[in-house]
Amino acid sequence: MSKNVFTWERNFKDIILELVPEFKKCVGFKQNNPHHIYDVWKHTLHALEATDESYDSITKLAILFHDIKKPECYREDKDGIGHFYGHSYAGADYVNNLFRFMCLPDSITIPVCQLIRYHEIQFEDSDEFVYKWIDRIGDLQFRRLLDLKVADVAAQNPLYRSNKYKILESLINRQNRIREERDKLITIK
């Protein structure tokens, strides 16, 4: 999908907006936040563009829908900065209902909704954080969550990306090391 996402949008935008009318609210919806330079719809497309063949369909679906409820959850602070409190939970609930209406299997619905729900957690650069989230959602889902965040950050303001990328890269390295350590323990047994 990555490099062809804007061709896809030109050819199929009207279709996806009819299939999922909630996306209509995202088109042109300004985020009014220094961390964002695109409206919600364009941000989503740029996040999809940042994916490659290593991203599975679960992760790509989560990226497509991760900010679908931002317009509904939009609030401005006293300085006029836009915030989207609760959009990840509202989005997960919406997508759960949508996917159930579409009769998609739980093997798609549950992991996609889980990724959407947790994509706004505060990421901490520590082994404890990695262990906690692997225990909570599993190794594969945690890696998908990190991949979603990498794509999400790629679609944000370049001025703020560097530090976010450093944390995500460190978490990926930590997860890989922890996985190798666990694999060695399993092999020894």
Give, region by region, the residue ranges found by the protein language model.
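Detector for Asparagine
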Residues: N4, N11, N32-N33, N96-N97, ...
